[in-house]
């Protein structure tokens, strides 16, 4: 929780240390290293926790009444890109860089996590394998845009771009499931 909050405050994973985490959590380094073998392992846990929370929110939204398009739009705006969502501060490249520093067991955990997310999503959204791959790429575009810092004058353009991407993704999902 403290690390997640730190990522939010710092607007990304760059530039903070184990000491920053322990200070935010008000624990000693020994306690930190009792729980996590490294900063990267801690960050992995934050991502895993965040994805689980997003998955639960996704299921809740998908169970509600409404069109698939409106539910996808709501999920993307209110959960996937909420103000404190890790997707705003933690890019796919960041996650890949962290995985490179961790033992292979973390890659296996990431694969299981991805499979669980995909299997759950497939119960609500009927897409072919190629369409799922396209959706994942579209979500990567959304995350890429969300994680980038822009000059103050471009913030409005960023917000507009995110909105266009959200509606495009929701349109795509609804259109493909009707085919």
PLM regions: where:
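Hydrophobic alpha-helical connector segments
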Residues: 45, 56-85
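A short secondary-structure junction motif
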Residues: 53-54, 82-86, 116-120, 142, ...
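Helix-turn-helix
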Residues: 7-41, 45
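Amphipathic alpha-helical segments used for helix-helix packing
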Residues: 74-104, 148, 152
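Hydrophobic/aromatic-rich alpha-helical bundle segments in the mid-to-C-terminal region
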Residues: 122-168, 176-179
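Generic hydrophobic, amphipathic alpha-helix propensity
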Residues: 1-7, 21, 46-50, 54, ...
């Amino acid at each position: 929780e403290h690390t997640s909050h730190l990522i939010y405050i710092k607007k990304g994973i760059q530039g903070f240390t184990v000491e920053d985490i322990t200070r935010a959590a008000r624990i000693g380094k020994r306690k930190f290293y009792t729980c996590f073998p490294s900063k990267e392992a801690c960050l992995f846990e934050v991502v895993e926790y965040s994805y689980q929370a997003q998955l639960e929110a996704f299921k809740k939204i998908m169970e509600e009444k409404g069109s698939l398009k409106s539910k996808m739009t709501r999920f993307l705006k209110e959960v996937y890109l909420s103000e404190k969502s890790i997707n705003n501060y933690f890019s796919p490249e960041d996650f890949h860089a962290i995985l490179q520093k961790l033992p292979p067991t973390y890659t296996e955990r990431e694969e299981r996590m991805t499979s669980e997310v995909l299997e759950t999503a497939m119960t609500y959204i009927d897409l072919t394998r190629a369409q799922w791959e396209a959706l994942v790429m579209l979500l990567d575009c959304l995350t890429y845009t969300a994680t980038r810092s822009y000059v103050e004058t471009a913030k409005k353009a960023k917000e507009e771009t995110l909105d266009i991407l959200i509606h495009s993704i929701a349109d795509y999902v609804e259109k493909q499931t009707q085919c």
